[in-house]
Amino acid sequence: MTMKVKILYFASLREAVGQSGEELELPAGVETVGALRAHLAGRGEGWQALAAGRNVRAALNQRMAGADVPIGAGDEVAFFPPVTGG
């Protein structure tokens, strides 16, 4: 079973990947936020900004989400760098 999700990229991640968002049909086995990050990082150079170990935050349907949070069909996943204030 495949599922389509909406992915949004913000700030420096948007610049690194060259787009602000996309709709993506996920391959089998990509069922969590962490698995999605790994899948996207495998696309190549600019996408390495999403690789594990990089300081990237994720939100699922506008709520903060860890790597082990499951993704469902029609979900919106946003990736962004940490925000600091001062």
Q: Whereabouts are the PLM-identified features?
A:
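Ubiquitin-like/PB1-type beta-grasp interaction modules and other compact soluble beta-rich domains
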Residues: M1-G85
